Curated annotation (Swiss-Prot):
Keywords: NAD, Oxidoreductase, Tricarboxylic acid cycle. One of its GO terms (molecular function) is L-malate dehydrogenase (NAD+) activity. Transmembrane segments: none annotated. The keyword Transferase does not apply. This is Malate dehydrogenase. The lineage of its organism: Bacteria, Pseudomonadati, Thermodesulfobacteriota, Desulfuromonadia, Geobacterales. The active site is at residue 176. NAD(+) binds at residues 10-15, 34, 96, 119-121. It catalyses: (S)-malate + NAD(+) = oxaloacetate + NADH + H(+). PANTHER family: L-2-HYDROXYCARBOXYLATE DEHYDROGENASE (NAD(P)(+)), L-LACTATE DEHYDROGENASE.
Amino acid sequence: MARKKIALIGGGQIGGVLAQLAALRELGDVVMFDIVEGLPQGKMLDIAEVGSVDGFDCNLKGTNSYEDIKGSDVVIVTAGLPRKPGMSRDDLIEVNSKIMTSVAEGIKANAPNAFVIVISNPLDAMVTLCQKITGFPYNRVIGQAGVLDSARFKTFIAWELGVSVKDVNAMTLGGHGDDMVPLVRYASVNGIPVMELLERKYKDKAKAKEVMDAMVKRTRGAGGEVVALLKTGSAFYSPASSAIQMAESILKDQKRVLPTCAYLNGEFGVKGFYVGVPCVLGENGVEQILEFELDAEEQAMMDKSVAAVKELVGSMK
Protein backbone atom coordinates (compact mmCIF):
# COMPACT_ATOMS: atom_id res chain seq x y z
CA MET A 1 0.00 0.00 0.00
CA ALA A 2 1.34 3.42 -0.95
CA ARG A 3 2.35 5.70 1.87
CA LYS A 4 0.37 8.82 2.60
CA LYS A 5 2.01 12.13 1.74
CA ILE A 6 2.07 15.26 3.88
CA ALA A 7 3.15 18.64 2.52
CA LEU A 8 4.29 21.42 4.83
CA ILE A 9 4.15 24.96 3.46
CA GLY A 10 6.63 27.05 5.43
CA GLY A 11 10.02 25.99 6.73
CA GLY A 12 10.08 28.05 9.90
CA GLN A 13 9.93 26.94 13.51
CA ILE A 14 6.47 25.37 13.26
CA GLY A 15 7.32 23.67 9.97
CA GLY A 16 10.40 22.04 11.47
CA VAL A 17 8.49 20.62 14.43
CA LEU A 18 5.69 19.45 12.13
CA ALA A 19 8.17 17.54 9.98
CA GLN A 20 9.77 15.88 12.98
CA LEU A 21 6.43 14.88 14.51
CA ALA A 22 5.07 13.54 11.22
CA ALA A 23 8.21 11.44 10.83
CA LEU A 24 8.19 10.17 14.41
CA ARG A 25 4.56 9.08 14.07
CA GLU A 26 5.23 7.68 10.58
CA LEU A 27 2.18 9.41 9.16
CA GLY A 28 3.67 9.20 5.68
CA ASP A 29 6.29 10.75 3.46
CA VAL A 30 6.86 14.45 4.15
CA VAL A 31 7.81 17.31 1.84
CA MET A 32 8.58 20.80 3.16
CA PHE A 33 8.24 23.82 0.88
CA ASP A 34 9.76 27.23 1.53
CA ILE A 35 10.79 30.11 -0.72
CA VAL A 36 14.19 30.42 0.99
CA GLU A 37 16.71 28.29 -0.89
CA GLY A 38 18.44 25.71 1.28
CA LEU A 39 16.23 26.19 4.34
CA PRO A 40 13.74 23.35 3.80
CA GLN A 41 16.44 21.12 2.31
CA GLY A 42 18.66 21.59 5.36
CA LYS A 43 15.89 21.02 7.90
CA MET A 44 14.63 17.87 6.21
CA LEU A 45 18.14 16.46 5.84
CA ASP A 46 18.75 17.11 9.53
CA ILE A 47 15.57 15.22 10.51
CA ALA A 48 16.13 12.39 8.01
CA GLU A 49 19.59 11.65 9.41
CA VAL A 50 18.17 10.57 12.78
CA GLY A 51 15.71 8.06 11.33
CA SER A 52 17.87 5.20 12.60
CA VAL A 53 18.05 6.78 16.05
CA ASP A 54 14.36 7.63 16.40
CA GLY A 55 13.23 4.51 14.57
CA PHE A 56 11.15 5.91 11.72
CA ASP A 57 10.98 5.01 8.05
CA CYS A 58 9.72 7.70 5.70
CA ASN A 59 10.98 9.86 2.89
CA LEU A 60 11.70 13.48 3.79
CA LYS A 61 12.29 16.16 1.18
CA GLY A 62 12.88 19.91 1.26
CA THR A 63 11.99 21.95 -1.79
CA ASN A 64 11.55 25.42 -3.27
CA SER A 65 9.10 24.21 -5.92
CA TYR A 66 5.37 23.74 -5.42
CA GLU A 67 5.51 20.92 -7.97
CA ASP A 68 6.97 18.67 -5.28
CA ILE A 69 3.74 18.79 -3.24
CA LYS A 70 1.87 16.94 -6.01
CA GLY A 71 0.01 13.89 -4.72
CA SER A 72 -0.21 15.19 -1.16
CA ASP A 73 -3.04 13.86 0.98
CA VAL A 74 -2.75 16.62 3.58
CA VAL A 75 -1.19 20.07 3.26
CA ILE A 76 -0.40 22.01 6.45
CA VAL A 77 0.15 25.75 5.96
CA THR A 78 2.37 27.65 8.39
CA ALA A 79 3.77 30.26 5.98
CA GLY A 80 3.58 33.85 7.17
CA LEU A 81 5.19 36.28 9.56
CA PRO A 82 5.00 35.42 13.29
CA ARG A 83 3.93 37.85 15.98
CA LYS A 84 6.35 40.04 17.88
CA PRO A 85 5.84 41.38 21.42
CA GLY A 86 2.99 43.87 21.56
CA MET A 87 1.36 42.61 18.36
CA SER A 88 -2.01 40.94 18.12
CA ARG A 89 -2.65 38.16 15.61
CA ASP A 90 -4.82 40.61 13.68
CA ASP A 91 -1.85 42.95 13.11
CA LEU A 92 -0.45 40.41 10.65
CA ILE A 93 -3.41 40.42 8.27
CA GLU A 94 -2.08 42.63 5.47
CA VAL A 95 1.28 40.95 4.91
CA ASN A 96 0.08 37.41 5.60
CA SER A 97 -2.89 37.81 3.24
CA LYS A 98 -0.44 38.32 0.39
CA ILE A 99 1.56 35.27 1.44
CA MET A 100 -1.58 33.12 1.79
CA THR A 101 -2.79 34.15 -1.65
CA SER A 102 0.41 32.84 -3.22
CA VAL A 103 0.36 29.68 -1.08
CA ALA A 104 -3.27 28.86 -1.88
CA GLU A 105 -2.62 29.26 -5.60
CA GLY A 106 0.31 26.84 -5.32
CA ILE A 107 -1.83 24.29 -3.48
CA LYS A 108 -4.71 24.62 -5.94
CA ALA A 109 -2.43 24.01 -8.92
CA ASN A 110 -0.43 21.13 -7.48
CA ALA A 111 -2.47 19.35 -4.79
CA PRO A 112 -6.11 19.72 -5.89
CA ASN A 113 -7.30 16.69 -3.93
CA ALA A 114 -5.57 17.45 -0.63
CA PHE A 115 -7.04 18.34 2.73
CA VAL A 116 -5.67 21.67 3.94
CA ILE A 117 -4.96 22.60 7.57
CA VAL A 118 -4.11 26.27 8.07
CA ILE A 119 -2.06 27.45 11.06
CA SER A 120 -1.00 30.89 9.78
CA ASN A 121 -2.31 33.93 11.68
CA PRO A 122 -4.67 35.65 11.86
CA LEU A 123 -6.13 32.16 11.62
CA ASP A 124 -9.81 32.84 11.01
CA ALA A 125 -9.05 35.20 8.13
CA MET A 126 -6.28 33.06 6.63
CA VAL A 127 -8.37 29.87 6.45
CA THR A 128 -11.20 31.87 4.88
CA LEU A 129 -8.84 33.27 2.25
CA CYS A 130 -7.27 29.87 1.58
CA GLN A 131 -10.65 28.27 0.90
CA LYS A 132 -11.76 31.14 -1.30
CA ILE A 133 -8.68 30.98 -3.51
CA THR A 134 -8.41 27.18 -3.74
CA GLY A 135 -12.14 26.75 -4.21
CA PHE A 136 -11.86 23.44 -2.36
CA PRO A 137 -14.97 22.07 -0.60
CA TYR A 138 -15.39 23.51 2.90
CA ASN A 139 -14.90 20.11 4.52
CA ARG A 140 -11.37 19.96 3.04
CA VAL A 141 -10.11 23.35 4.26
CA ILE A 142 -9.89 23.86 8.01
CA GLY A 143 -7.92 25.82 10.57
CA GLN A 144 -5.93 24.82 13.63
CA ALA A 145 -6.73 26.93 16.66
CA GLY A 146 -9.18 25.22 18.98
CA VAL A 147 -7.02 22.16 19.64
CA LEU A 148 -4.23 24.43 20.88
CA ASP A 149 -6.47 26.86 22.77
CA SER A 150 -8.20 23.93 24.47
CA ALA A 151 -4.86 22.31 25.30
CA ARG A 152 -3.72 25.51 26.99
CA PHE A 153 -6.97 25.70 28.97
CA LYS A 154 -6.53 22.05 30.05
CA THR A 155 -2.94 22.74 31.11
CA PHE A 156 -3.87 25.64 33.37
CA ILE A 157 -6.68 23.60 34.95
CA ALA A 158 -4.33 20.66 35.60
CA TRP A 159 -1.75 22.95 37.21
CA GLU A 160 -4.36 24.60 39.41
CA LEU A 161 -5.86 21.32 40.63
CA GLY A 162 -2.63 19.32 40.80
CA VAL A 163 -3.91 16.55 38.52
CA SER A 164 -2.70 14.86 35.35
CA VAL A 165 -3.51 16.89 32.26
CA LYS A 166 -4.49 13.57 30.64
CA ASP A 167 -7.58 13.49 32.85
CA VAL A 168 -8.71 17.05 32.09
CA ASN A 169 -11.39 17.60 29.46
CA ALA A 170 -12.02 21.16 28.33
CA MET A 171 -12.75 23.01 25.12
CA THR A 172 -12.81 26.46 23.57
CA LEU A 173 -15.12 27.78 20.87
CA GLY A 174 -15.10 30.83 18.62
CA GLY A 175 -12.30 32.74 16.97
CA HIS A 176 -8.59 32.34 17.60
CA GLY A 177 -8.12 35.60 19.45
CA ASP A 178 -8.80 37.54 22.61
CA ASP A 179 -12.55 36.85 22.30
CA MET A 180 -12.30 33.04 22.20
CA VAL A 181 -14.81 31.18 24.39
CA PRO A 182 -13.36 28.71 26.93
CA LEU A 183 -16.36 26.60 27.99
CA VAL A 184 -16.22 26.62 31.78
CA ARG A 185 -19.48 24.71 32.20
CA TYR A 186 -18.17 21.69 30.29
CA ALA A 187 -14.67 21.57 31.81
CA SER A 188 -14.15 18.41 33.85
CA VAL A 189 -11.59 16.11 35.42
CA ASN A 190 -12.54 12.53 34.56
CA GLY A 191 -16.16 13.64 34.43
CA ILE A 192 -16.10 15.72 37.62
CA PRO A 193 -16.94 19.39 36.92
CA VAL A 194 -13.90 21.61 37.39
CA MET A 195 -15.96 24.30 39.12
CA GLU A 196 -17.10 21.78 41.73
CA LEU A 197 -13.48 20.79 42.39
CA LEU A 198 -12.44 24.44 42.68
CA GLU A 199 -15.29 25.16 45.10
CA ARG A 200 -14.23 22.21 47.26
CA LYS A 201 -10.60 23.30 47.13
CA TYR A 202 -11.27 26.89 48.17
CA LYS A 203 -14.51 26.30 50.14
CA ASP A 204 -15.72 29.55 48.61
CA LYS A 205 -17.75 29.87 45.41
CA ALA A 206 -16.64 33.45 44.82
CA LYS A 207 -12.96 32.49 45.13
CA ALA A 208 -13.48 29.48 42.85
CA LYS A 209 -15.02 31.73 40.20
CA GLU A 210 -12.17 34.21 40.58
CA VAL A 211 -9.62 31.44 39.99
CA MET A 212 -11.52 30.12 36.96
CA ASP A 213 -11.87 33.62 35.52
CA ALA A 214 -8.10 34.02 35.80
CA MET A 215 -7.55 30.74 33.92
CA VAL A 216 -9.97 31.82 31.20
CA LYS A 217 -8.14 35.13 30.87
CA ARG A 218 -4.76 33.38 30.73
CA THR A 219 -6.06 30.98 28.07
CA ARG A 220 -7.19 33.87 25.90
CA GLY A 221 -3.81 35.55 26.23
CA ALA A 222 -1.66 32.42 26.25
CA GLY A 223 -0.20 32.93 22.79
CA GLY A 224 0.78 36.48 23.66
CA GLU A 225 2.35 35.26 26.90
CA VAL A 226 4.68 33.00 24.90
CA VAL A 227 5.46 35.79 22.44
CA ALA A 228 6.36 38.17 25.28
CA LEU A 229 8.72 35.62 26.82
CA LEU A 230 10.41 34.57 23.56
CA LYS A 231 10.74 38.17 22.33
CA THR A 232 11.79 37.01 18.85
CA GLY A 233 8.86 34.90 17.67
CA SER A 234 5.73 33.03 18.65
CA ALA A 235 4.78 29.55 19.86
CA PHE A 236 5.84 26.68 17.62
CA TYR A 237 5.90 23.39 19.56
CA SER A 238 2.26 23.57 20.60
CA PRO A 239 0.73 24.68 17.28
CA ALA A 240 2.66 21.95 15.47
CA SER A 241 1.54 19.21 17.86
CA SER A 242 -2.05 20.41 17.59
CA ALA A 243 -2.04 20.39 13.78
CA ILE A 244 -0.45 16.94 13.69
CA GLN A 245 -3.28 15.60 15.88
CA MET A 246 -5.77 16.93 13.33
CA ALA A 247 -3.82 15.55 10.36
CA GLU A 248 -3.49 12.14 11.99
CA SER A 249 -7.24 11.96 12.60
CA ILE A 250 -7.86 12.62 8.90
CA LEU A 251 -5.12 10.36 7.53
CA LYS A 252 -6.05 7.44 9.79
CA ASP A 253 -9.82 8.08 9.72
CA GLN A 254 -9.81 8.22 13.53
CA LYS A 255 -12.95 10.36 13.71
CA ARG A 256 -11.56 12.32 16.66
CA VAL A 257 -13.79 15.04 18.06
CA LEU A 258 -11.53 18.08 17.92
CA PRO A 259 -12.18 21.83 18.19
CA THR A 260 -11.66 22.96 14.61
CA CYS A 261 -11.92 26.22 12.72
CA ALA A 262 -14.62 25.05 10.31
CA TYR A 263 -17.06 26.66 7.90
CA LEU A 264 -20.49 27.03 9.48
CA ASN A 265 -23.75 26.92 7.57
CA GLY A 266 -26.19 27.77 10.32
CA GLU A 267 -24.63 25.78 13.16
CA PHE A 268 -24.47 27.72 16.43
CA GLY A 269 -26.46 30.43 14.67
CA VAL A 270 -23.53 31.28 12.36
CA LYS A 271 -23.79 31.17 8.59
CA GLY A 272 -21.05 31.74 6.04
CA PHE A 273 -18.00 32.07 8.28
CA TYR A 274 -15.13 29.94 9.62
CA VAL A 275 -15.39 29.65 13.41
CA GLY A 276 -13.97 27.26 16.01
CA VAL A 277 -16.43 24.46 16.89
CA PRO A 278 -16.20 20.76 17.83
CA CYS A 279 -15.89 18.62 14.69
CA VAL A 280 -15.50 14.96 13.83
CA LEU A 281 -12.36 14.69 11.67
CA GLY A 282 -12.01 11.61 9.48
CA GLU A 283 -11.12 10.48 5.98
CA ASN A 284 -13.56 13.04 4.54
CA GLY A 285 -12.17 15.93 6.55
CA VAL A 286 -14.93 17.60 8.55
CA GLU A 287 -17.50 14.80 8.72
CA GLN A 288 -19.73 16.26 11.42
CA ILE A 289 -20.09 19.50 13.32
CA LEU A 290 -21.30 18.67 16.83
CA GLU A 291 -23.77 21.36 17.77
CA PHE A 292 -25.09 21.74 21.31
CA GLU A 293 -27.04 24.24 23.38
CA LEU A 294 -25.20 27.23 24.80
CA ASP A 295 -26.51 29.04 27.85
CA ALA A 296 -27.15 32.79 27.74
CA GLU A 297 -23.68 33.76 28.96
CA GLU A 298 -21.91 31.36 26.58
CA GLN A 299 -24.04 32.53 23.66
CA ALA A 300 -23.22 36.16 24.40
CA MET A 301 -19.49 35.36 24.41
CA MET A 302 -19.87 33.32 21.22
CA ASP A 303 -21.71 36.18 19.52
CA LYS A 304 -18.94 38.58 20.51
CA SER A 305 -16.27 36.20 19.22
CA VAL A 306 -18.08 35.67 15.91
CA ALA A 307 -18.51 39.43 15.51
CA ALA A 308 -14.73 39.84 15.89
CA VAL A 309 -14.17 37.15 13.23
CA LYS A 310 -16.58 38.88 10.84
CA GLU A 311 -14.83 42.21 11.37
CA LEU A 312 -11.42 40.62 10.80
CA VAL A 313 -12.48 38.83 7.62
CA GLY A 314 -14.15 42.00 6.38
CA SER A 315 -10.90 43.93 6.79
CA MET A 316 -9.07 41.83 4.19
CA LYS A 317 -8.39 43.81 1.03
